[in-house]
Amino acid sequence: MKADFWLQRWSAGQIGFHQSEVNKDLQQYWSSLNVVPGARVLVPLCGKSQDMSWLSGQGYHVVGAELSEAAVERYFTERGEQPHITSQGDFKVYAAPGIEIWCGDFFALTARDIGHCAAFYDRAAMIALPADMRERYVQHLEALMPQACSGLLITLEYDQALLEGPPFSVPQTWLHRVMSGNWEVTKVGGQDTLHSSARGLKAGLERMDEHVYVLERV
C-alpha cells in the first residue's frame, strides 16, 4: 500500500474510513488500560479522527502520526484551532494544547521524536495495511513504545478472498502469532459489523467481525 494511495484519497475526499463521531469502543474500553491522565498516547495513522479530541479531553497528551497534510489541517480547522507548526527533520509538527500531530512517514518516526508514550490507540492503522506491511508495522510500533506500556487495538476480520481492502482483514490467529511474543493480547469486545458495510454486503460476505483487544507489553 503506497503512500500515494492515501494522499490521493484525502485529496479527493474519499475518506469513507473516517468516523465522524468518537468511537464507542474507545469510550467503553479505554479505562481497561488504566493509563494515568497526563500520559502521552500515540495514535498511529490518525487522520482527522475525533477520537484524538476525546483522548485529549480525558486529560491525555495525544501524539498523532499522519501522512496526509490535508488530514492534519482539516483536523485543526474543524476544531477551530490554529496550531503551532514547526519542522522536525522530515516531519512537520502541528501542536496545540493537549495534542501534537507529526505529519510524515510513520515508519520514519523514532522513539526520540515522540517521547515516552505510555499507551497507544489503533482503530484505523493496522487495518489500513496489507498483510505484507502489517508485520513491519508491529515491529516499528514496538520500537516506538517503551517496555512498560499498553494499547487498545480495534481490527476487522472477514473473508479477504471475497473483498479487497482497505480496510484489510486481520485474523485473530495472525495477531496472536505476531504479537503474543512481546504482548499479552486480551480480546475484550467485538461484534459483527457487516450490516454497516455496503461493500461487504455487495461482495457476499457472511460476516465482518470487529475485534477489540487490550494489549499489555510483557
Swiss-Prot record:
Enzyme Commission number(s) of this protein: 2.1.1.67
PROSITE patterns, sorted: SAM_MT_TPMT
GO BP terms: methylation; response to metal ion; response to tellurium ion
GO molecular function: thiopurine S-methyltransferase activity
GO cellular component: cytoplasm
Catalytic reaction list: S-adenosyl-L-methionine + a thiopurine = S-adenosyl-L-homocysteine + a thiopurine S-methylether
Class of the enzyme per the UniProt entry, highest EC level: transferase
Sorted UniProt keywords: Cytoplasm, Methyltransferase, S-adenosyl-L-methionine, Tellurium resistance, Transferase
Main location: cytoplasm
UniProt keyword Cytoplasm present: yes
Gene3D superfamilies per record: Vaccinia Virus protein VP39
Subcellular location(s) per record: Cytoplasm
Transmembrane intervals: none
Keyword Lipoprotein attributed: no
Amino-acid positions noted as binding S-adenosyl-L-methionine in the UniProt annotation, renumbered to this chain: W10, L45, E66, R123
Domain of life of the source: Bacteria
Pfam families: TPMT (PF05724)
Family that this chain belongs to: Belongs to the class I-like SAM-binding methyltransferase superfamily. TPMT family.
PANTHER family linked: THIOPURINE S-METHYLTRANSFERASE (PTHR10259:SF11)
Function: Involved in the biological cycling of tellurium and selenium. Tellurium resistance (Ter) mechanism.
Descriptive protein name: Thiopurine S-methyltransferase
Organism: Pseudomonas syringae pv. pisi
Originating gene: tpm
